[in-house]
């Protein structure tokens, strides 16, 4: 309401927004932009009721994107296979450009940037909340001594970005779990045991153990030349646990054949 009123230069009380439940969305969709497009047309075509719909193609082309991320990790291990130092730096754009009252909401509506008197794109400051935005799940759940964790807010990238479900957790967890696999391989250690060696969280431990049991039970059926990859995370280190194993095969033409997925989730 505040964003539409500001963009159309109307009083707040002159704008009535009626919410209608619809399909869910994992983050920031084009719903606010489509609503403003309808209001913008209605202001110029008085005495008409305006029904405006974005097509699926419209939404995929114009909705905010989840931000690209680059993660740089370094780690050291001792002779006992224990991680003794850990550094994780993440570079990314903002995950928050929803129209929020008090934060120049009109500038967060897409069409305001194509009007004759266009708005500048908003510059959002870095989020400082625990596990928010870029640094969501940058803190490893594993027991590392004094991990070094740094986030870098990158500005002036070419695409409009905003919330895509899990925010920075996607990239950060992928980076952490990839690093754990690389370290386990370099040390010639079982990737399950290597993770368990660095976990103090009992629920997390049981989640990983259960996954290993499922994998081991089915291992006799694994096709030749198939590879198995595993990953583990707890969302925001305070919500649900998930352990995942993927069995796949890659042929000489780099074609990937997905064979089986094992998944253990604890959200109790």
Question: Where are the regions that the model predicts?
Answer:
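Structural alpha/beta core scaffold segments of enzyme domains
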Residues: 1-268
């Amino acid at each position: 309401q505040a964003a539409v009123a500001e963009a159309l230069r109307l009083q707040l009380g002159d704008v009535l927004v009626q919410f209608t439940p619809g399909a869910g969305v994992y983050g920031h969709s084009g719903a606010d932009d489509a609503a403003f497009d309808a209001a913008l047309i209605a202001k110029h075509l008085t005495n008409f009721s305006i029904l405006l719909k974005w097509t699926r193609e419209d939404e995929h082309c114009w909705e905010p994107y989840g931000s690209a991320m680059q993660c740089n990790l370094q780690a050291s291990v001792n002779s006992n296979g224990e991680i003794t130092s850990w550094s994780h730096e993440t570079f990314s754009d903002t995950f928050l450009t929803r129209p929020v009252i008090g934060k120049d909401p009109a500038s967060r509506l897409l069409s305001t940037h194509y009007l004759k008197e266009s708005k500048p794109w908003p510059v959002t400051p870095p989020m400082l909340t625990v596990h928010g935005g870029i640094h969501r799940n940058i803190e490893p759940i594993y027991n590392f001594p004094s991990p070094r964790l740094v986030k870098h807010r990158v500005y002036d990238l070419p695409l409009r970005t905003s919330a895509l479900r899990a925010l920075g957790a996607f990239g950060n967890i992928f980076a952490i779990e990839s690093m754990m696999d690389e370290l386990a391989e370099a040390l010639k250690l079982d990737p399950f045991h290597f993770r368990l060696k660095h976990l103090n969280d009992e629920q997390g431990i049981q989640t990983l153990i259960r996954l290993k049991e499922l994998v081991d039970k089915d291992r006799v059926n694994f096709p030749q030349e198939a590879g198995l990859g595993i990953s583990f995370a707890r969302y925001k280190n305070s919500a649900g646990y998930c352990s995942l194993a993927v069995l796949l095969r890659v042929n000489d033409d780099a074609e990937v054949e997905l064979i089986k997925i094992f998944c253990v989730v604890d959200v109790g």
